[in-house]
Amino acid sequence: MSTYPIYLRPELAPIIAETPEQTTWDLPAMRAGGDALLANPHEADNRVEVSARGRTFIPADLAEDAPLIISIHGGGYVAGRAAFDDAKNDELATRFGAIVVSPEYRLAPEFPFPIPVDDCISALAEALERFGHERPTFILGDSAGAGLAYSMVSRLCGLGLQMAQDEAIAARYKRIASLIRGIILLEPCVDPTLSTPSSRFFAEGPVWTRRAAAGAWRHYFGVPLDAEVTIPLRLIEAAFPKPSAEFREEGFPPALIVVNPVDPLRDEGIALATGLVDAGCIAEMHMFAGTFHGSLSMPGSVTWHEIQLLIDRFVKENSAVR
């Protein structure tokens, strides 16, 4: 991190001390540290259905036109559980009267790309079949969850270097893509090259570091940590296609992107937002003073309230559009 003072919001400072070190080079330790945070589980206000596939929050007074939100947790593609986001997802279900589905996607390196993306697509497809295809549908992700959100929507739209699939699956994916009204990306983790200025300037974090990112990306793409090889470009292009005119032509949905000023991932989120705009897509980007990686959805914080206001307006605007 920089050697001179960087402003951080005082209300968010406790997160830095409370977050276990993100040791992507020692996954058992990283995962155990995360699991320890579940010692005091959240008591939900809404009905929660739990299965091996994920967690679903359903308001008691569910309206016929209530939105469906697929909320994808973070964890560097290698850690995390759907339960980690219970407080956030419960609050989203209450605020928007929405069905919130949090996929329990499989983690790398045991299940590298594209398996986690496929799991998230399956969760969306199952939710649409169960709750109806007419509901305004949004995809929300945080950090690696935002990367998965971007990957799954790109794949559904048939963008970038696609994995092999038959015509029936491609047609099914296009139908699903047409139902997505918007994509919400919080502090997106979408650039495995680690080549941005912010990835160097904030190499020591706080919370997420350049070393952690390097390990996470190798795990995600099935490259051994100690291998003297780079991640194959074809895999990067398949996972995170660069915005182009094809995005607009294929109907990539409106995007709401939030980045942190103090975050090694900051510049890749900015590049994604401007890339979408330059490609002719609808995109907006926000950056709040003093936020850092992992701080956007701290329960009860002013920051999380501000983020919810953004999401509220974005969901309302795009729910009314067909």
Language-model features: locations:
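Gly/Ala-rich beta-loop-alpha elbow adjacent to hydrolase catalytic centers
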Residues: 141, 145, 149
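Active-site glycine-rich loops that stabilize anionic/oxyanionic intermediates
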Residues: 73-78, 262
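A glycine/proline-hinged amphipathic helix-loop "lid/cap" segment
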Residues: 1-61, 226-229, 319-321
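Short beta-strand-to-loop junctions in surface cap/lid or active-site-entrance loops
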Residues: 53-65, 240-248
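Alpha/beta hydrolase fold serine-hydrolase catalytic domain that processes acyl esters and thioesters
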Residues: 26, 33, 37, 135, ...
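Catalytic nucleophile-loop/oxyanion-hole region of alpha/beta-hydrolase
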Residues: 81-82, 88, 102-136, 299-305
